[in-house]
């Protein structure tokens, strides 16, 4: 992408053929606008209402071709939907209005009503996000992704159906419009089996999508590596995954998040420093570390930190306010900045995702989360004084200041009595 504020848009069209007969995306500059996050359209983590379970899989041969064609048709339909929405002077205000307006045109590309509604939901989400961020909807285009989804929450999910043996029956669409039903058996993490069993047992409504992460040809056979993503209510997740249901602690914790570590400072109600500890995830931030591996490393580190906080009496945890960090995921496009060349952007997004993960997992330990303004917790005269006084590194000092700021805002510091 070049220029300052504008975008070069790509007109949607049918897939072109790549070498080997596989469809190739039309050429042009693309903005990575789509983010498959388990949240309704909000900017600020306190409003999280859903969580996504990610189940990886590998398939080859005919099944891989069926998944690939469905994902490609879904993306082609999304291009058309985005183009039609941009050309519509006044867009509907309701879900049913969007569906009544665009269903027929999108069905011509991907002839399955649930996938059609998935396309419409996706594009409407972009539109609503643009409205909240003040970004011009007509200047947005799609990122480089391959996926398809059923956005309608139901049980069972008809197009991507979970079975008792943890396999999934998936409805696929060929390039000629022919429908098929294939079986994919993903890898199920041990802790997710409990949730999947409860989904089946309680008939919990959810949504599902297939995301193709990688593909290629090996020994003249197409292979696909992807993920099945199930989105469930976060209350359901907490109900069945909570590790500690009671917390009798009376202390406070402050967390300073960086790209390779999280620093925890534990203080009492008088603001006195009790404990400090650094939790490292250096490997996750190294170049070449796969995103799934990075998520796993960070996730385990977050659990270690929360377990430490719980066993050291932390009742309330203070984090940097994620509102600004969340908005940075999309606001950078106003200035036409390139993702991979903007270090500050990458740092902000990485930190925001870690804060997001901490926010999501903290209730599992019966710890309350509150947010504070992180400004002047890293570079200030107060920061330097505390750093020298306690002999702390600068990140632990920032965590201590975050804890103090949180107590001042939510629970005034009490004076020490003799």
UniProtKB/Swiss-Prot annotation:
Region annotation (Disordered) ranges: 1-24
Organism superkingdom: Archaea
Record-stated family: To A.pernix APE_1276 and S.solfataricus SSO2105.
Name the UniProt record assigns to this protein: Uncharacterized protein APE_1804
Organism: Aeropyrum pernix (strain ATCC 700893 / DSM 11879 / JCM 9820 / NBRC 100138 / K1)
Taxonomic classification: Archaea, Thermoproteota, Thermoprotei, Desulfurococcales, Desulfurococcaceae
């Amino acid at each position: 992408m070049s220029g300052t504020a504008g975008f070069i848009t790509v007109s949607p069209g049918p897939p072109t053929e790549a070498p080997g007969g596989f469809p190739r995306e039309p050429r042009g500059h693309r903005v990575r606008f789509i983010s498959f996050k388990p949240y309704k359209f909000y900017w600020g983590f306190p409003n999280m209402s859903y969580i996504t379970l990610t189940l990886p899989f590998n398939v080859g041969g005919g099944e891989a071709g069926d998944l690939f064609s469905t994902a490609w048709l879904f993306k082609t339909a999304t291009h058309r939907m985005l183009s039609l929405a941009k050309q519509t002077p006044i867009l509907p205000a309701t879900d049913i209005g969007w569906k009544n307006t665009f269903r027929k045109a999108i069905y011509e590309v991907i002839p399955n009503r649930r996938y059609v509604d998935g396309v419409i939901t996706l594009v409407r989400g972009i539109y609503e996000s643009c409205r909240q961020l003040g970004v011009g909807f007509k200047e947005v285009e799609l990122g480089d992704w391959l996926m398809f989804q059923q956005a309608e929450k139901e049980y069972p999910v008809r197009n991507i159906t979970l079975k008792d043996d943890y396999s999934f029956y998936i409805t696929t669409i060929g390039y000629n419009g022919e429908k098929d039903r294939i079986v994919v058996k993903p890898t199920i993490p041990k802790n997710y089996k409990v949730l999947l069993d409860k989904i089946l047992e309680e008939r919990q409504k959810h949504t599902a999508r297939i995301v193709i992460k990688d593909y290629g040809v090996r020994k003249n056979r197409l292979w696909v590596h992807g993920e099945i993503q199930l989105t469930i209510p976060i209350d359901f997740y907490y109900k069945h995954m909570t590790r500690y249901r009671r917390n009798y602690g009376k202390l406070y914790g402050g967390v300073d998040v960086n790209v390779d570590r999280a620093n925890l400072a534990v203080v009492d109600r008088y603001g006195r420093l009790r404990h400090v500890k650094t939790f490292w995830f250096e490997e996750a931030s190294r170049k070449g570390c796969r995103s799934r591996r990075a998520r796993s490393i960070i996730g385990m580190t977050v659990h270690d930190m929360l377990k430490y906080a719980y066993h050291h009496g932390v009742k309330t945890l203070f984090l940097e306010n994620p509102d600004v960090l969340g908005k940075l995921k999309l606001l950078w496009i106003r200035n036409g900045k390139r993702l991979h060349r903007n270090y500050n952007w990458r740092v902000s997004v990485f930190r925001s995702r870690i804060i997001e993960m901490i926010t999501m997992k903290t209730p599992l330990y019966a710890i309350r989360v509150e947010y504070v303004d992180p400004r002047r917790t890293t570079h200030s005269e107060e920061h330097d004084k505390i750093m020298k006084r306690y002999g702390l590194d600068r990140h632990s000092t920032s965590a201590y200041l975050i804890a103090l700021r949180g107590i001042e805002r939510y629970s005034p510091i009490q004076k020490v009595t003799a």
